[in-house]
Amino acid sequence: SPFMQAIETLNRTVFLALNASPATPEWLIAAGVLIANYAILLVPVLLVSLWLAGGDERRALAVRACLVGLLALGINQVIGIAWYHPRPFAIGVGHTFLAHAPDSSFPSDHATLLSAISFTLLSAGKRRTGLLVLSVDIAVAWARVFIGVHWPFDMVGAVIVASLACMLGSTLWRFGGMTVTRALITVYRKALAMTIGERWLRP
C-alpha cells in the first residue's frame, strides 16, 4: 500500500542518516558494537540486585519486571513468525559492523526488553532506576541502528510491544503476582538457607 511504502521510505532514510560507514572513526564503531552487544547485561544484573536487596516490595518488582520482559519477548516471537521483515544487511542497505543472523528485524528484542524493564520500574515509582534503564535503552536503540543490524522502526515497534506487555503484565499481576513472589521467596530461602544463615545474603 502507498502508506506502507511511505513508512518504508522514511525508515530507510532515517536508517541511512544514522548508520555508520567505513569513514566513521573506529573508536565510535567499537563503542557502538560494545553497547549493541553488552548493554543488555544490565537487565539480569539489575533484577538480581533488586532481589538480593531484600524486602517483599523490591522482590515483587523484580519478579514483575521479569514477567513483563518475558511477555514482551514472547510477543516479539509471535510477530517475527507472523511477519518477516528483513534486516538492512539482508537486502544490501547501508553498512554492517556486527555479524548477525538474517532473522526478522521487527521489533528489536534488545530494545523491547530494556523498554519493558524501564516502563515497569517507572510505573512502580522507581524513577531514578527506571530512567537509568531508559537511557541505556536509548543508547542500545541508537547503537543497533548505527552498526547496521536494525532499522529505526524496529525500535518504534519495541516501544509499542513493551507498552502492550506492561498493560498485559499489570492485569496478570493482579491475578497472582504476589502469590508467585512469595513462593519464589520461600524457594530462595530454602535453597540458600546456609548462605542466608551465615548472613552473606538477606533473607
Where are these regions (language model features)?
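Membrane-embedded catalytic cores of phosphoryl/pyrophosphoryl-handling enzymes
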Residues: L98-P203
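Small-polar-interrupted transmembrane alpha-helices in polytopic inner-membrane proteins
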Residues: C66-I81, G130-A143
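Membrane-helix interface segments
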Residues: P25-W27, D56-L61, G125-L131
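Alpha-helical transmembrane segments
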Residues: I35-A39, A65-C66, A111, R128-L132
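Transmembrane alpha-helix boundary and packing residues in multipass membrane permease domains
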Residues: L46-S49, Q77, F119, M167
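Short helix-capping/hinge motifs at transmembrane helix termini and TM-loop junctions
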Residues: A53-G54, W83-H85, I147-W151
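N-terminal transmembrane-helix/juxtamembrane module of multi-pass inner/ER membrane proteins
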Residues: S1-L42, Q77-D103, L184-P203
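Interfacial segments of alpha-helical transmembrane regions
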Residues: L46-I75
